[in-house]
Amino acid sequence: MRRGLLLLNLGTPNNADIRAVKLYLREFLTDKRVIDLPTIPRYILVYCLILPFRSPKSAQAYQSIWTEKGSPLLYHSQNLVTKLQSALKDEYKIALGMRYGTPSITTALAELKDCHSLTILPLFPQYSSAATGSAIEKTLSHLANQEIIPSIKIIRDFYQRPEYIQAQAKIMKPYIKDNFHLLFSYHGIPERHIHKSGCDTLCPQTCTPIYDKNQACYRAQCYQTSLLLAKELQLGTHQYTTAFQSRLGKTPWIKPYTDEIFAELISKGIKNIVVSCPSFVADCLETLEEIGIRAKEQWEKLGGEQFILTPCMNDHPEWIKAIQSIVNEQF
């Protein structure tokens, strides 16, 4: 009998019009792990304040990156599945499930129903409750309703895996130039999520090395990712910076903020930067529009000169090999 491999990602609207984007945002933002408020305040916030104002802006942003093939996140993910299935041959049956939108986790699990074992791989290198935790919870809730539950292995995170670091670094390396500063921009999360992960206090600068207490700290995992990538790329500490993007609302999110770090870099005389987004394995709204368009415009307005965004791993052969190694090690 075949093994099943379930790849999980966040999701994308079905198209870039306001209605589709609003439906997607509604499903996304009402998730209790994303906005961790009690149900009634969460729904009031989402339905009365966020959706009416954010949906048109988000639709416009999606339209700026939408292609003839549709959503970049979706087609990169589908290409990944196709190439990974070819590489793994009959050893695994692979399905893609999106936490929000389509293809759904329910649909993906139906494709894998005849597999005697199931490896669940959320495509988030660093663990966060809002992304990884939510995707795993949704998957397990569906599996709980099956008559026959397969043997299950969950790969919670892989930020420290040499295969991931080496693949990411090889894809980045052609874009790294001697007179450029490297900015690692990770998706941010609210500070309170860090406290809920077991960290009593937030580290003032870089997080301390990973140990038992902060092993589930998203910020610590991101800083460790930067450290490992810089080492693989043979960069000194003065040659790169770590920051966090995509904050929403007025509550404090983990710092430093990507959009605020630009002025600091300019003040240091840095004019040319390369930006990489290691928390995203596939190019999407947050990389292509937020960084590739808006952040680039901000950099140029501040007096910056060259701005290079490295592509995500998408369906790159090095990423395919990395997943093969990570998954096969489970057995």
UniProtKB/Swiss-Prot annotation:
Location(s) in or outside the cell: Cytoplasm
GO molecular function annotations of the record: ferrochelatase activity; metal ion binding
Gene3D superfamilies: 3.40.50.1400
Domain of life: Bacteria
One BP annotation, GO: heme biosynthetic process
Record-listed E.C. numbers: 4.98.1.1
Protein name (record): Ferrochelatase
Lineage of producing organism: Bacteria, Pseudomonadati, Pseudomonadota, Gammaproteobacteria, Legionellales
Gene coding for it: hemH
